[in-house]
């Protein structure tokens, strides 16, 4: 991937791409605030959480097939461009607190693509968040998908039921119709991730019950 093609318009990118870019812009906003308030430790934790929880364990894992071989379709191009943007931005965000690794990551990226003429991440402009890229509703929905998936997988491990063994149903407690609507919007994603045939909603219960 050399990033020679024009950017795929945001409106034409899949929801999962728009989500990670929304979270990325939220991260830029929060990390910039941390640095301005002399809170480098907090900034580092935010960057670490983004890379581990959102980028690696969720975005990359859910999109493995898009990155694999096959024709270079717009969908695949969108995935590559989105991931590249995340990595390049993370390199810039972490540069003040992890100067050597950030510089290596940034140098590797721009060497492959030639997208920047500067020779070091420390000479590049610090990222600026784009408010129009932030979709809080989408972030909330995806966070719920992550939370439910994490709990169900933890329950599977607890009772020693492997993910490849399908479950008939999980019952998810919801506190109101808004929460139910958010989870309903990502229900198929949850079902695929935990290998379950049906999601049912229950009122007032605590935790997630596996049936």
Task: Specify the residue positions occupied by each region the protein language model found.
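Feature 926 captures the class I aminoacyl-tRNA synthetase adenylation module centered on the KMSKS loop
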Residues: 1-211
């Amino acid at each position: 991937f050399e990033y020679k093609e024009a950017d795929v318009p945001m409106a034409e990118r899949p929801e999962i791409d728009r989500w990670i870019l929304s979270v990325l812009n939220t991260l830029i906003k929060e990390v910039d605030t941390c640095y301005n308030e002399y809170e480098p430790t907090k900034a580092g934790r935010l960057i670490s959480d983004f890379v581990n929880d959102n980028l690696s364990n969720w975005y990359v894992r859910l999109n493995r097939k898009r990155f694999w071989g096959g024709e270079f379709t717009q969908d695949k191009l969108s995935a590559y461009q989105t991931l590249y943007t995340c990595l390049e931005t993370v390199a810039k965000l972490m540069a003040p607190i992890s100067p050597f690794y950030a510089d290596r990551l940034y140098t590797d990226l721009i060497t492959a693509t030639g997208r920047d003429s500067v020779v070091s991440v420390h000479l590049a402009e610090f990222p600026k968040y784009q408010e129009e890229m932030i979709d809080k509703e989408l972030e909330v929905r995806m966070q719920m998908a992550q939370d439910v998936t994490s709990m169900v997988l933890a329950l599977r491990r607890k009772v020693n039921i492997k993910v490849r063994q399908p479950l008939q149903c999980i019952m998810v407690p919801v506190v109101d119709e808004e929460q139910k609507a958010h989870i309903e919007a990502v229900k198929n994603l949850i079902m695929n991730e935990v290998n379950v045939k049906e999601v049912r909603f229950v009122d007032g219960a605590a935790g997630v019950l596996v049936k």
